[in-house]
């Protein structure tokens, strides 16, 4: 039985073949209609045959049917290293992205971002920090005005007349309600702004009452009166047209959110 054709050993002069290829030869496959088993796989193509391959440089291969099978290089016009792609191997560096390939004299970057990702410089946030500090300073000033020592006109004095260990105190206890600070928004309703006047009225009423009541009883009576007057003021505020309108708008918003 004859030996298979693909197992027949052929002596090929590889140094001569590669030398011919590096000079100006083109590696050709055997035509589909011819099978030269004893010829050299490297053939020299005439110059007229390579006339139509102007854009393909040396080292190309033409396969069966005259089609180009590979392209080892592209002819470049002009001299110098400008515009050529340089491949640098990241020796001794780990976790390097493919961004080490650069054009020209560009420096390699260690960034994990791709080359097409827009890189912007660090923005100056000092203006934002100053604005935040100014806002905090204003809020601190408002809180300070809200808890600062009130003027004598804003004081509402409640004479407690509570003896301590059988002796009167040198200084009377006073309940202080500071006035509304300018430019500071209070979270409570405007009805509580009349607490100052309410406390004054209760103090005047207590002076005319009997002194037989204990201090605890007087305190409880004062708390009940203040609570009663404040609730009356709140009810009056709720009965105003603006309050009714606000309540209706609130209900409408609640119903619309449930749709």
Swiss-Prot record:
Organism domain of life: Eukaryota
Any one GO biological process: negative regulation of ubiquitin protein ligase activity
Localisation: Nucleus
Keywords: Cell cycle, Cell division, Developmental protein, DNA replication, Mitosis, Nucleus, Plant defense
Main location: nucleus
Disruption phenotype: Premature occurrence of endoreplication during organ development leading to an increased DNA content in hypocotyls and trichomes associated with an increased branching of trichomes (e.g. four to five branches). Reduced accumulation of CYCA2-3 during the S phase leading to a premature exit from the cell cycle, thus triggering the onset of the endocycle. Increased tolerance towards ultraviolet B light (UVB), probably due to the enhanced polyploidization. Considerably larger average cell area in the leaf adaxial epidermis leading to fewer but larger epidermal cells.
Chain ranges passing through the membrane: none
InterPro entries, per database record: POLYCHOME/GIG1
Keyword Cell division: yes
Induction description: Expressed in an S phase-dependent fashion.
Record function comment: Negative regulator of the anaphase-promoting complex/cyclosome (APC/C) ubiquitin ligase required for proper mitotic progression and cell fate determination; inhibits premature cell differentiation. Prevents DNA endoreplication by promoting the maintenance of the mitotic state by preferentially inhibiting APC/C(FZR) and triggering cyclins accumulation (e.g. CYCB1-1, CYCB1-2 and CYCA2-3) in a temporal manner. Required for megagametophyte and endosperm development. Counteracts the activity of CCS52A1 thus inhibiting the turnover of CYCA2-3. Confers immunity to bacterial pathogens (e.g.
Name this protein carries in UniProt: Protein POLYCHOME
Organism: Arabidopsis thaliana
Organism phylogeny: Eukaryota, Viridiplantae, Streptophyta, Embryophyta, Tracheophyta
């Amino acid at each position: 039985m004859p030996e298979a054709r693909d197992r027949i050993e052929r002596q090929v002069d590889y140094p001569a073949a590669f030398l011919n290829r590096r000079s100006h030869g083109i590696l050709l496959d055997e035509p589909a209609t011819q099978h030269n088993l004893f010829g050299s796989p490297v053939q020299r193509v005439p110059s007229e045959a390579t006339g139509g391959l102007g854009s393909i440089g040396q080292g190309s291969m033409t396969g069966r049917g005259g089609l180009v099978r590979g392209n080892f290089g592209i002819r470049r016009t002009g001299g110098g290293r400008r515009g050529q792609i340089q491949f640098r191997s990241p020796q001794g560096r780990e976790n390097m992205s493919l961004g080490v390939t650069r054009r020209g004299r560009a420096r390699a970057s260690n960034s994990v971002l791709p080359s097409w990702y827009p890189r912007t410089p660090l923005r100056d946030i000092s203006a934002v920090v100053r604005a935040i500090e100014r806002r905090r300073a204003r809020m601190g000033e408002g809180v300070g005005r809200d808890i600062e020592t009130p003027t004598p006109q804003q004081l509402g004095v409640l004479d407690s007349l509570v003896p301590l260990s059988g002796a009167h105190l040198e200084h009377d206890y006073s309940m202080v309600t500071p006035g509304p600070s300018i430019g500071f928004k209070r979270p409570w309703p405007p009805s509580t702004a009349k607490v100052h006047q309410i406390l004054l009225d209760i103090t005047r009423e207590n002076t005319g009452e009997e002194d037989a009541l204990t201090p605890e009883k007087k305190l409880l009576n004062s708390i009940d009166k203040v609570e009663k007057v404040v609730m009356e003021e709140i009810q009056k505020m709720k009965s105003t047209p603006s309050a009714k309108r606000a309540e209706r708008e609130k209900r409408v918003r609640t119903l619309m959110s449930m749709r």
